[in-house]
């Protein structure tokens, strides 16, 4: 991604869009809060596409006999969990709550399945040892108190969503009409949701067999050394 803008640039564009360039009715601090909330909404839309617009981060978990392990403070959502053996990684399957009894009663020293639960990752059976790699999407940066030089990636003009949504909030507080910006916001959202699916051009999105024995963490031929 290369289309980046600073927080002060986004703030200026939002003021221009709301026709409040020289107005002190909305302070910069308050506008930063609007922008931060709008950025988080754009972040949600891009994550929902299922494609990696934001670089996943890895957390190392060491089994100690417990079932649950705290996720990092900057956690948004889990991509996958792998069990490590040497230089190889074996993918764990995600379990549904209705399947819990099957796995917690299974015994064994190594976890075979995982589940993201609140601020924790559940591994079952509770591993008494071993190393696990938790790959997750980080949460969006809180721009409320960020420096003016903080950059925002607009990908392909999608920063306009943040600009228009922040302008809408400014006009809303001023009790001015928001009809025009709401119409533009809807058009932008539809465009982003459609085009966000086109991040990978060479390989079409496909259904993955997650119940096959080949995806079980006990099978060596499904190893992976990298994400």
Region roles according to the model:
Residues 1-227:
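Glycine-enriched, solvent-exposed interface loops adjoining structured elements
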């Amino acid at each position: 991604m290369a289309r980046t803008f600073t927080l002060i640039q986004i703030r200026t564009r939002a003021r221009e869009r709301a026709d409040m360039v020289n107005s002190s009715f909305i302070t910069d601090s308050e506008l930063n809060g609007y922008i931060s909330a709008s950025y988080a909404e754009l972040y949600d839309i891009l994550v929902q596409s299922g494609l990696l617009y934001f670089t996943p981060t890895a957390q190392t978990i060491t089994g100690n006999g417990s079932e649950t392990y705290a996720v990092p403070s900057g956690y948004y959502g889990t991509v996958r969990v792998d069990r490590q053996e040497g230089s190889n990684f074996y993918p764990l399957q995600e379990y549904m709550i209705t399947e819990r009894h099957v796995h917690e009663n299974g015994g064994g020293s190594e976890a075979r399945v995982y589940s993201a639960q609140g601020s924790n990752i559940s591994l079952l059976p509770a591993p008494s040892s071993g190393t696990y790699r938790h790959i997750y999407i980080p949460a969006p940066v809180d721009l409320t108190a960020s420096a003016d030089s903080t950059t925002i990636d607009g990908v392909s003009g999608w920063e306009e969503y943040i600009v228009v949504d922040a302008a809408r909030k400014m006009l809303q507080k001023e009790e001015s009409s928001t009809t025009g910006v709401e119409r533009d916001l809807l058009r932008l959202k539809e465009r982003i949701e459609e085009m966000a699916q086109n991040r990978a051009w060479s390989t079409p999105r496909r259904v993955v067999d997650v119940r096959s024995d080949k995806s079980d963490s006990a099978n060596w031929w499904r190893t992976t050394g990298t994400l």
